Amino acid sequence: MRFARVAITGATGPLGLALVDYYLARGVAVTAIVHPGSARISYLPTQAGLGVVFCDLASLGTLGALLPTDHDAFFHLGWSDTENHATRNDPVRHANNILYTLEAVKLTKALGCSVFVGAGSHIEKAGVAPDCHTEREESYGIAKYAAGRLSAMLCEQMYLRYCWGRVLSIYGPGERETTALMYCIGTLLKGEKPSFTAGEQLWDYLYAVDCARAFALMAEKGRHGAVYDVGSGTLRPLKEYFALTRDAINPALPLGLGEKPYLPGQPMRMCFDVNPLRTDTGFSPKTTFEEGIRETIKWVETRQGVKTGA
């Protein structure tokens, strides 16, 4: 399926940025829907084919009459109030996100798109194995699940093809400084020691560029109604990821493993089944963690004006 124009909410996050780059590199026009006043607007490229529209998620319903109706696919990656644990567990705020997702489906139809692809989270579900616990009683996870199921129903009613991608953990340029890997990078680049738990949690990290390709393949080849788990398919202890990150910056720097306690109810093994995504779309990651983290470090260095090992 060949697309000429796509629309993306959450375009300044790591997945959104990578998806923008993916389509622009292939000559596909992109409408990036960005929160007004976003400090991350500078992360977007400035090149032909990219149109930036400033609109908060609560106002998505106003865009149908303002944007062209020649779009082919809509990617809803935006989600408000995920900055910290307090907002992640605010029931009212996340109930609003469910409504925003349904407005995104309506906008998908108004823009002439044939397919809606939404970004979910591993927190929506329990693991695929008895010892693979990923579910937390958090408003964020509950709302993500509800948004995914209700948007599927609305797509069915509106005769739109629907796919939902449940992402475990991605990393790459554009990620928030507060995530574990970005905290690790930022601290090590200052020559300081980052503090962590023991880092024994088994984790799956996927480079944002690979994740973007997975979402593009969902839009092009995904099975209607499918909910795909999106990850690399490889589990490693978090402490290994931290060590590889440190080694890419300066192997002599210390890591403060075990200096922080685990949170209550901390899942120790996060995993899911990536085989349906591979079977339906042919997706497989192309970037090793070692390669992806080097690119991410370079991006942070450019932003901070520092050099590896400094």
Where are these regions (language model features)?
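N-terminal Rossmann NAD(P)H-binding glycine-rich loop of SDR-like oxidoreductase domains
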Residues: 6-26
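C-terminal substrate-binding subdomain of Rossmann-fold SDR/epimerase-dehydratase oxidoreductases
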Residues: 192, 196-310
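SDR active-site strand-loop-helix element
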Residues: 9, 33, 74-80, 116-122, ...
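NAD(P)H-binding glycine-rich loop region in Rossmannoid oxidoreductase-like domains
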Residues: 54-96
